[in-house]
Amino acid sequence: MAKMSTKKVYSFLLQAFIFSAIMLISNIIATHLPIPMPSSVIGLVILFSLLCLKVIKLEQVESLGTALTGIIGFLFVPSGISVINSLGVMGQYFVQILTVIVVATVILLAVTGLFAQFILGKDEKETEDIKELKVVNKGRKHGKVA
C-alpha cells in the first residue's frame, strides 16, 4: 500500500471538514425554512457563494470534489432505490407528474431561449456600437468628421 504523506492526509481531512460543515449548516437551514428545500441544494448554493466570495479557495475543495464527481453514479443509488420504492405513488399520480415535467421543461426551454436571445442581442448591439465608434474615430484621424 502506498504511503500517503501527512500533507495529503491533512488536505483530505480539511476538505472533508469543509464539505461536512457546509452540509451541517445547510441541514440546519433546511429544517428552519418554511418551504421544503433539499439541504443538498442549499449546500451547493452556500459552497458556490463561499467560492465566489473567496472565503474558500478552489484548491481547498477541488481534489475531494473531483473524487466525489468520479463516484457520482454510486452516490445516486439510494435515490434510485427511493424512486423504485415510490413507484406505486408515482403510478397513482402519473398524469400529474408527467404534466408538471412537460410544462416545467417547456417553461425552462422558453426562458433559456429568451434569455440567450436577450444576451446575444445586447452583445450584437455592443459590437455595432464599437464598429460605429471605430468609424467615427477613423474619420476624425483623417479630418472627415460630420
Swiss-Prot record:
Signal sequence extent: none
Spans traversing the lipid bilayer: 9-31, 35-57, 64-83, 93-115
Entry membrane topology: Multi-pass membrane protein
Stored Pfam families: LrgA
Domain of life of the organism encoding this protein: Bacteria
Annotated InterPro entries: Antiholin-like_LrgA (IPR023736), LrgA/CidA (IPR005538)
GO biological process, one term: cytolysis
Any single GO CC term annotated in Swiss-Prot or TrEMBL for this entry: plasma membrane
Role: Inhibits the expression or activity of extracellular murein hydrolases by interacting, possibly with LrgB, with the holin-like protein CidA. The LrgAB and CidA proteins may affect the proton motive force of the membrane. May be involved in programmed cell death (PCD), possibly triggering PCD in response to antibiotics and environmental stresses.
Annotated family: Belongs to the CidA/LrgA family. LrgA subfamily.
Name the record gives this protein: Antiholin-like protein LrgA
